[in-house]
Amino acid sequence: MLILSDIPGVNIEDEKSLSKLRRLLSEYRLDQLILIGEVLPKVAAQFDVPSISYSDTAAFLANIRSLSFENATVLLKGGREFHFERISQLLVAKSHDTVLEINLNALENNLNVYRQLLPKQVKLMTMVKAFSYGSGSFEIANLLQFNRVDYLTVAFADEGVDLRGAGIKLPIVVMSPDESSFESIVQYNLEPEIYSFRILFSFLNFLKTKQITSFPIHIKIDTGMHRLGFMPDEVDRLIAVLRAEAVLEVKSAFSHLASAGNEKDREFTQQQIDLLDEFTKRLESGLGYSFLRHIAATSGIELWPNAYFDMVRLGIGLYGIDIERHDLPIREASTLKTNVTQIKYLPASETVGYNRHGVLYRDSKIATIKIGYADGYDRRFGNGVGKMLVNGFLVPTIGDICMDMCMLDVTDVEVGEEDEVIVYPDIKSAAKAIGTIPYELLTSISQRVKRVYFYE
């Protein structure tokens, strides 16, 4: 569902603007369109999407209870004077659920910041694996497709199948293909990463049974990460196999920097870059054709311009988190929010939660909030380790984290039931508190947590 307002300065009745909007709407494959303003409702019949029109935001809000948002992904795009933040707040309040808000303006900003670091000829691959770092695969992939990135990357073939089913047409690389996924890879025009002779021969044999030729693949090279990939001394055998078969076409060869952000490992990182350069030059010479080369992910983009080669891979930096260069105008794109379900006033010596671990040493005000470990809030955040933001103040957890809820000590804060709670005011600090990284916190957010996407 898209909720769209008139855009100041844009004459939507102009055929050029109208045509562009029709194209955008077709790319989003909408089930319903809600139009707000004086101009858009006049051209509603021009869109091949069921629509409802309102004269202004107040009129929409007055009728919001008559609309169903169950199981819907809602995208808001409104001019500032339409104050769509009121709609976002009401949609979240209507559900009284924990939500992950994704700011699409911030995502686009971050994408453009990294693009500006790159020479024009360098292509951009973006990572949408692991539910796009928790942010929602199709919605983020659609934004990236609209912004014309060159490649998308997923971990498993079923993620790529879902994106194809949702209308994503960009090339999609599958990082962890296996024999059971070959059929889907071919059927949905996905491009597998080939990292060993076992997977290479298995895929070759599969393609031969289907009488398929020139199928695109991406060669993974182990330059020092020692996770997946062909070792440098295997290049001659790899060339021999690929030359003997007309079944495969190498679209790229790549590796992964193990420690690009660590100053102490600069020599090791340079060795990895040099190894990729040497391996790929030999591979290109042996095959008799060129392909894309890439090794730099987010940290590499920020710190290693000599590692750009032909393409770079943007992952966590797209979401504005865990970056190495603090001079970049990056914005955090996601905010995990919940609300206060109940407040209790308890005397000193009472205990809170399972196993009575939350001991009160003073008369206290305790807030129960609607997030637990089934939502992806780690149990290690219990008993004061986790800190959340309530009405501008950091407050600690108290007691063990429950499956669907947890408790906060809000004794020193003015707070009421249904007040908003920011779960990770500083996600890097939160990750450090339990000895992990922001990636894990983001990718652990359960899919039962609603995702709310908005443009400012």
Where are the predicted features?
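Short, hydrophobic beta-strand segments that form beta-sheet elements in well-ordered domains
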Residues: 31-38, 53, 74-76, 152-154, ...
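Active-site-proximal beta-alpha core segment in soluble small-molecule metabolic enzymes
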Residues: 99-101, 106-108, 122-292, 308
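Active-site anion/phosphate-binding pocket segments in diverse small-molecule metabolic enzymes
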Residues: 101-103, 108-111, 116, 123-126, ...
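ATP-dependent carboxylate-amine ligase
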Residues: 1-109, 116, 157
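Residue-level signal for inorganic ion chemistry
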Residues: 6, 33, 76, 163, ...
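Active-site regions of enzymes building and remodeling cell-envelope glycoconjugates
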Residues: 47-59, 169-170, 189-192, 309-315, ...
